[in-house]
């Protein structure tokens, strides 16, 4: 008995989507990462609500994000160089341990009634410094868990775990902040780091993929920027990614203001974050199922993010806002996963840490610019515009980037029209013109 093409495709898709999980080390790591990031999103949600309660201003929430992500902007690429030169597993063990200490200190100070806004800002800076080194090491370590042909899938699953945890984390924070208070949510987050520390210690290091470490010396920022500027495709992707990352992903500010001032519900903030998390998980898994990621997938999901963001900003009811938040998360996660995959596809092993760090700078490190701007717009122009302006800028950036890529992939007509036209064909991508 033979299987139909439909049956074959239906059984192949799930295995393609989760093919990285056939490795025990990858299963251990992703399970621990899921538990840990659920706790992280609990803390982020509780922190935004706490700062807003203390000040009543979205601008203060934006300043908190500035403190958290400014170290990423200043240290991100250098931290990526450290990840390229040293054992990424050891770096992740150290940074994850320090993140647990930061969360425990935050919770303890709150429970002792010693936590003030200046202390929140200082601990946010501490969090940012640790995260600047954790991000490239942890994300770069994912590549060591799987075979080279599975790197794109593993990175997409990593994005799915990181963004999918937003479904559970904010929902738990919204439900438990009232009865438990923010302090115990911070303590719970500290405890969740054991879920990622144990796999890092318990995994079989003999099954890790060999990596080429970068040599010491050089100028990591200049090297990474030089590599990108030499590749027009990567350059366009990074510029669009930077614009969108700066202005479109400031959800702790814009969704908080939208939930409280537009719909009068603090708990709706957690529900909106959870809805974007649901969409994010779907978008990441869809991207993970694709054998190769093109720039057209990147631009298409950027457009989805912009359009659905506008719909969310001016949603007429709370439930309409929740429904609109799902495609916002889907487009946003697929957009981020596509950028990560394109960088990995186009970069050598000894440059990946720096390029991942540069991508993190473009996406997270620009938050010190976008978050205060978003908070100021929320306080002075309204919650709708704090989300709407970023969506509009996203559509403009995507349209310009798409136009540049479209022009660069069009076949060139020779000066002698009697000569046949030539095109560069990418057979690995289904035989189409190289995007």
Put a short name on every predicted segment.
Residues 2-435:
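Alpha-helical transmembrane-bundle signature of multi-pass membrane transport and export proteins
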């Amino acid at each position: 008995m033979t299987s139909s093409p439909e049956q074959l495709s239906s059984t192949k898709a799930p295995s393609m989507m989760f093919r990285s999980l056939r490795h025990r080390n990858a299963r251990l790591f992703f399970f621990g990462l899921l538990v840990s990031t659920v706790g992280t999103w609990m803390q982020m949600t509780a922190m935004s609500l706490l700062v807003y309660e203390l000040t009543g201003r979205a601008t203060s929430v934006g300043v908190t994000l500035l403190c958290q992500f400014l170290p990423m902007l200043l240290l991100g690429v250098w931290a990526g160089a450290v990840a390229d030169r040293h054992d990424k597993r050891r770096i992740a063990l150290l940074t994850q341990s320090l993140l647990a200490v930061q969360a425990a200190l935050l919770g303890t100070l709150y429970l002792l009634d010693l936590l003030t806004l200046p202390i929140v800002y200082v601990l946010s800076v501490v969090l940012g410094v640790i995260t600047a080194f954790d991000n490239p090491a942890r994300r770069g370590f994912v590549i060591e868990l799987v075979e080279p042909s599975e790197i794109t899938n593993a990175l997409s699953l990593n994005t799915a775990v990181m963004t999918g945890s937003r479904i559970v984390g904010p929902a738990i924070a919204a439900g438990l902040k009232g009865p438990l208070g923010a302090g115990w949510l911070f303590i719970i987050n500290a405890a969740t780091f054991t879920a990622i520390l144990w796999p890092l210690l318990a995994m079989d290091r003999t099954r890790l993929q060999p990596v080429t470490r970068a040599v010491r010396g050089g100028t990591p920022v200049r090297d990474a920027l030089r590599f990108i500027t030499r590749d027009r495709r990567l350059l366009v992707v990074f510029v669009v990614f930077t614009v969108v990352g700066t202005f479109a992903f400031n959800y702790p500010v814009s969704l908080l203001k939208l939930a409280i001032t537009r719909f009068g519900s603090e708990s709706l903030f957690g529900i909106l974050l959870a809805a974007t998390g649901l969409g994010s998980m779907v978008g990441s898994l869809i991207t993970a199922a694709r054998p190769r990621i093109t720039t057209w997938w990147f631009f298409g999901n950027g457009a989805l993010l912009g359009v659905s963001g506008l719909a969310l900003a001016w949603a007429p009811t709370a439930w309409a806002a929740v429904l609109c938040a799902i495609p916002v998360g889907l487009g946003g996660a697929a957009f981020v996963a596509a950028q990560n995959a394109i960088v990995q596809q186009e970069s050598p092993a000894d440059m990946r840490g720096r390029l991942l760090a540069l991508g993190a700078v473009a996406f997270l490190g620009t938050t010190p610019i976008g978050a205060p701007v978003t908070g100021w717009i929320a306080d002075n122009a309204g919650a709708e515009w704090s989300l709407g302006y970023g969506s509009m800028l996203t559509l403009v950036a995507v349209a310009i980037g798409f136009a540049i890529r479209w022009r660069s992939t069009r076949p060139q007509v020779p000066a002698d029209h009697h000569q046949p036209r030539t095109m560069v064909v990418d057979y690995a991508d289904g035989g189409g013109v190289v995007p």
